[in-house]
């Protein structure tokens, strides 16, 4: 069964759009599965998921240990890992076609200035952008990618 794993700070965003229309019906009929992982559950005692970028820089990034623990918790973690990022490869028909042939995918949704670069490299994440515009985070891009 095709599976989408989503790592996000906003898990409540997904059930509505993915529970209605043709996607909702196909999920009810067992055609695909959705695993939403709340990154906040993988924070330490202080409940902080963000920190200054390693090596300096503006803003805050999601901490690498939070992403690491969340990825390791997935039941099916052998899927390609896509990090939704404005600096990623721009989504086009060829990429969409290759994604549609996968058995599943893991989507990491950034927030703030993104996620720590070290975790992107460690997990060989594929950075992908859905276009040249600014969104409030990776969640709306993840919803778009799931619709492929």
What do the predicted segments below correspond to?
Residues 1-74:
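N-terminal nucleotide/polyanion-binding subdomain common to many enzyme families
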Residues 5-7, 35-37, 82, 105-107, ...:
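Hydrophobic/aromatic beta-strand patches that form the interior of the parallel beta-sheet core
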Residues 40-45, 89, 134-137:
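A short acidic, often aromatic-flanked loop/helix-cap motif at beta-alpha or helix-coil junctions
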Residues 61-111:
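S-adenosyl-L-methionine/SAH cofactor-binding core of RNA-modifying enzymes
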Residues 113-120:
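Short, glycine/polar-rich helix-capping loops at beta-to-alpha or helix-loop-helix junctions
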Residues 126-138:
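Short beta->alpha connector loops at strand-helix junctions that form conserved
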Residues 146-148:
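Conserved small/polar residues in nucleotide/adenosyl-binding loops
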């Amino acid at each position: 069964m095709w599976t989408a794993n989503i790592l996000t700070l906003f898990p409540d965003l997904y059930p509505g759009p993915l529970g209605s229309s043709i996607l909702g019906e196909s999920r009810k009929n067992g055609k695909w599965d959705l695993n939403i992982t709340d990154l906040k559950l993988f924070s330490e005692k202080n409940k902080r998921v963000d920190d200054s970028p390693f090596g300096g820089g503006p803003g805050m990034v999601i901490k690498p240990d939070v992403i690491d623990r969340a990825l390791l918790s997935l039941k099916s973690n052998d899927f390609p890992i896509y990090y939704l990022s404005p600096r990623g490869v721009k989504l086009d028909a060829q990429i969409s076609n290759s994604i549609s042939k996968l058995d599943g995918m893991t989507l990491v949704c950034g927030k703030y200035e993104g996620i720590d670069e070290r975790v992107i490299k460690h997990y060989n994440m594929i950075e992908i952008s859905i276009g040249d515009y600014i969104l409030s985070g990776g969640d709306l891009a993840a919803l778009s990618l799931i619709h492929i």
